[in-house]
Amino acid sequence: MESAPIVLDNGTGFVKVGYAKDNFPRFQFPSIVGRPILRAEEKTGNVQIKDVMVGDEAEAVRSLLQVKYPMENGIIRDFEEMNQLWDYTFFEKLKIDPRGRKILLTEPPMNPVANREKMCETMFERYGFGGVYVAIQAVLSLYAQGLSSGVVVDSGDGVTHIVPVYESVVLNHLVGRLDVAGRDATRYLISLLLRKGYAFNRTADFETVREMKEKLCYVSYDLELDHKLSEETTVLMRNYTLPDGRVIKVGSERYECPECLFQPHLVGSEQPGLSEFIFDTIQAADVDIRKYLYRAIVLSGGSSMYAGLPSRLEKEIKQLWFERVLHGDPARLPNFKVKIEDAPRRRHAVFIGGAVLADIMAQNDHMWVSKAEWEEYGVRALDKLGPRTT
């Protein structure tokens, strides 16, 4: 294990890191960097307050910190802060000497080329890695499922990508980005709870509401029925105990919260909802490959974990096909096949696919961009990673 390639999946909300062959990330922690609001307190409880707090450490004392997310919508926006996160990853968590090691990094589709170049430059020049490979997250999610073609719906904390892939090649001209994801759903749940009189306004409360969302929220299959149930019965009502011991009642908010994925206007976005986005993406593909895409709609990322999401997507995509392609003719509907791949481990699908790929590549030095190639060719060395969008 000591010499195995490192697999690092940088997400907007969480960093996932481990080694080739691992079935799960060794470590997962929030992608946050915090600095104390006041320097007066040196210690709180048994946590030492430092000038820069990162990841789990920052999360533990979040209310005392000015918190920054170095990544937005899946893309690194602040490399200075990102270096703090990477230092924490390699030296505090993995406790390794990165010099001469191999590392597989992940990137979103449509990641700006300059970003990939800066990321690789940092790995070679700041940390001294011997080999670097950058893989597109959606392709790794497919590999985790043992597939090479399909539409990956990768919904994390900061962004949802809809990525059609055919025979391991991303169809870049069709990649879609829906700027509604986990963080938006959490904010929306905060506003729904506020209407009930429960105020969550501190940064520390955000984490509390996120956990509540993950435990209680689900995607409604039939909105009218759920609305009726919440209005006329207490079937949907759940008690939830907050960290300070208070108990609150959560009812209709359980299904209203994830609804922002299907109705983005609820969180101020003018984009189409998730089902329509997927349908439009596949319909824009070449007619010969559409059937392969419909038969492998692969869910990936933490915001795809809601109970009820796969069946709602299937129902709405079939409905869209019925209305827009068949124009309401039910005779041909049985020939239309949709399959939603909802693997139980899809929260970590990108990491799992990365660990599989890094293991296959471990003994094939020519597949990695080496430090020697970087020193000789500079950013041109990255051409061997294959064509990428600019």
Curated annotation (Swiss-Prot):
UniProt-annotated binding residues for ATP: G156, D157, G158, R210, E211, M212, K213, E214, G301, G302, S303, S304, M305, Y306
InterPro entries from the UniProt entry: Actin (IPR004000), Actin/actin-like_CS (IPR020902), ATPase_NBD (IPR043129)
GO MF entries: actin filament binding; ATP binding
Biological process per Gene Ontology, one example term: actin cortical patch assembly
Swiss-Prot/TrEMBL keywords: Actin-binding, ATP-binding, Cytoplasm, Cytoskeleton, Nucleotide-binding
Subcellular location: Cytoplasm, Cytoskeleton, Actin patch
Membrane-spanning segments: none
Subunit structure as annotated in this protein's UniProt entry: Component of the Arp2/3 complex composed of arp2, act2, arc1/p41-ARC, arc2/p34-ARC, arc3/p21-ARC, arc4/p20-ARC and arc5/p16-ARC.
UniProt protein name: Actin-related protein 2
